């Protein structure tokens, strides 16, 4: 009887310790990104960014105040959401640069493609109330590679191509946040 109790106790302690280990590991592989409206500089919520086991990254938005429908959703090369000037016009979020493309492919492709920008994410879907809460999975990314980069939300959808318009035809940048180093 004592042996059975001892075995149960050891099992319970092992389970508890392994659960603590999992929680700590999960926290180390997760970061929350505050997203700001680029016109008003006000917060629209957060996106939790976490490593999905050893394969890809999951982006879980908790956003409000967006236009309903599909939005282009990308990782941009610089961790800076400030505006820049281009051809005499203000570009909101312009300091974030272009799509994250460490292999210099120069091509906008599907998020699962290995021949396009690594910063090409699946479209972000916003419900009829202006809220985005559906997770987005990016199979070609590693969290450690995107620390210090920007997450960008564009006004329109994304056709995952450079045709008929470059960069998926997503439209102007509407919201941005920086993934902490």
Residue ranges and their predicted role:
Residues 2, 7-181:
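N-terminal leader/targeting pre-sequences
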């Amino acid at each position: 009887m004592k042996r059975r109790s001892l075995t149960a106790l050891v099992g319970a302690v092992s389970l508890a310790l392994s659960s603590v280990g999992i929680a700590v590991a999960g926290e180390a592989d997760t970061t929350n990104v505050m997203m700001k409206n680029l016109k008003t500089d006000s917060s629209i919520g957060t996106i939790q960014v976490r490593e999905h086991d050893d394969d890809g990254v999951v982006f879980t938005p908790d956003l409000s105040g967006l236009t309903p429908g599909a939005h282009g959703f990308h990782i941009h090369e610089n961790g800076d959401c400030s505006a820049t000037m281009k051809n005499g016009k203000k570009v909101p979020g312009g300091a974030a640069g272009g799509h994250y493309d460490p292999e210099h492919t120069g091509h906008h492709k599907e998020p699962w493609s290995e021949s396009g920008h690594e910063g090409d994410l699946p479209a972000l879907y916003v419900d009829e109330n202006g809220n985005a809460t559906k997770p987005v999975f990016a199979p070609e990314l590693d969290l450690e590679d995107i620390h210090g980069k920007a997450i960008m939300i564009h006004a329109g959808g994304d056709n995952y191509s450079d045709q008929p318009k470059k960069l998926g035809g997503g439209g102007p940048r509407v919201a941005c946040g920086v993934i902490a180093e």
